[in-house]
Regions:
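An acidic/histidine-cluster motif and surrounding catalytic segment
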Residues: 1-93, 98-251
Length: 251
């Protein structure tokens, strides 16, 4: 009994790899979010993606949110996540380039239930950039950083998100944020990123989520063994600038 949100656009070959793993897990609820076309050139890929996710061969409650206009990566991701968590108290989030191990679904289900009411925990990550973290005997550990390449969380967390970055106008919040960034050796440009994102007038969920975790002293759960194969490490990637050859494998 688990909910899964899948975000996709016009890349059916990548999406098919993700959906193949979802089919093996047979979740009870699927939330399917697709951004709208930028023009006619996007329609073949958009239609092909819809065919991929229409291949549901198990008993499943399905919700569709297919946009008619193009919102872009941001704020689409924020919109999709707020939509899914408005309908489900806890949910796994996958994009079309996050291929999960089948074990990731059971891992999330167990921990979503276990930590549902523990407000110290903000999210469950599937990606471990060390591939296998040494010297840890348990299946997971707690961290103050997190990856968005396959994750799960609760509505209580997304309800804390500040879509309009109002914390930027609060001097005490900013003092605390600067101290946290310094203490944790976090990205020195994080506040600048938040300022730029607000100037753009869009909800960028990465900075919104990160700020929420910082202000609420949130912890992430990270698997000792990586559970996500990230396909987004390609030449046309939106967010990734590294090399596919250095990416850890999903187990």
């Amino acid at each position: 009994d688990v909910s899964v949100l899948i975000l996709f656009f016009n890349r059916p070959k990548l999406l098919a790899q993700v959906f193949e793993q979802v089919k093996k897990a047979r979740p009870a609820r699927l939330f399917l979010y697709q951004d709208g076309p930028r023009g006619e050139r996007d329609m073949p890929g958009i239609e092909a993606c819809r065919k991929v996710v229409a291949d549901i061969d198990w008993e499943c409650e399905v919700h569709h949110n297919y946009q008619e206009k193009n919102y872009g990566c941001d704020p689409s991701e924020y919109m999709a996540q707020k939509w899914a968590f408005s309908l489900s108290n806890k949910c796994i989030v996958l994009e079309d380039d996050d291929v999960p191990a089948v074990s990731f679904f059971g891992f999330c289900k167990e921990l979503l239930d276990k930590y549902e009411h523990d407000t110290r925990i903000s999210m469950i990550a599937g990606f471990n950039n060390e591939e296998i973290t040494p010297d840890i005997t348990s299946d997971y550990f707690f961290a103050t950083t997190f990856s968005i390449w396959g994750w799960a969380s609760w509505r209580r967390v997304t309800d804390q998100w500040d879509e309009f970055y109002t914390f930027l106008d609060d001097k005490e919040n900013m003092r605390q944020l600067k101290n946290l960034i310094h203490t944790r050796r976090d990205r020195k440009d994080f506040i600048y990123m938040c300022q730029r994102h607000r100037e753009h007038g869009k909800a960028y969920y990465e900075t919104i989520f990160h700020a929420s975790m910082l202000f609420n002293s949130g912890l992430s759960i990270v698997p000792t063994r990586n559970m996500i194969t990230y396909l987004g490490a390609t030449a046309d990637s939106t967010h990734f600038a590294g090399s596919v050859h250095t990416m850890p494998r999903g187990y």
